[in-house]
Amino acid sequence: MQVILLDKVAHLGTVGDQVTVKSGYARNFLIPQGKAVMATAANIAHFEARRAELEAKAAAVLSAAKERAAKIAAIGAVSVSATAGDDGRLFGSISAKDIADALVAAGIEVTKSEVRLGEGPLRTTGEHEVKVHLHAEVNAMVTVNVVAE
């Protein structure tokens, strides 16, 4: 099925690309998410009329993500406290939601889905490097300092 991308889609293309995808992927994901429309003659003409608007919107989203990445880089590290044993292992774990809440408390708008924990939740005290995926092209690293209560 031919679709026109309205947003950048990883491993597929950028705004305005006409790509061929499986019909289920288009009907169940791309079209309902607003990331693509079917490539009919009317939609192609409509898209060409809106191309500048969509590209400007995509550029604005990218610049906002870069600004948030700069704020995260400026902050450098956040602290999260949790109960821990004498050996430094936590009673429980620090999840992506806890890290996102710490970043929000520091003044940076981040959702838990943007926090990427490579090896799962943090289970020990100390400093851990965590990736924050803000945009398809923008990632930021933040140091999470887990301290025992």
From Swiss-Prot:
Which gene carries the instructions for this protein? Answer: rplI
Task: Please state what the protein is called.
Answer: Large ribosomal subunit protein bL9
**Keyword Nucleotide-binding found:** no
MF term (GO), any: structural constituent of ribosome
Coiled-coil region: none
Fetch the HAMAP family from UniProt: Ribosomal_bL9 (MF_00503)
What top-level branch of life does the organism fall under?
Bacteria
Ubl conjugation: is it a keyword of this entry? no
**Which keywords, in A-to-Z order, does the entry hold?**
Ribonucleoprotein, Ribosomal protein, RNA-binding, rRNA-binding
State one Pfam family annotation.
Ribosomal_L9_C
* Organism, as annotated: Haemophilus ducreyi (strain 35000HP / ATCC 700724)
- What is the documented function of this protein? Binds to the 23S rRNA.
Transmembrane domains' residue ranges: none
Quote the InterPro entries the UniProt record gives. Ribosomal_bL9, Ribosomal_bL9/RNase_H1_N, Ribosomal_bL9_bac/chp, Ribosomal_bL9_C, Ribosomal_bL9_C_sf, Ribosomal_bL9_N, Ribosomal_bL9_N_sf
Q: What is the lineage of its organism?
A: Bacteria, Pseudomonadati, Pseudomonadota, Gammaproteobacteria, Pasteurellales
Alphabetically, which GO biological process terms does the record hold?
Answer: translation
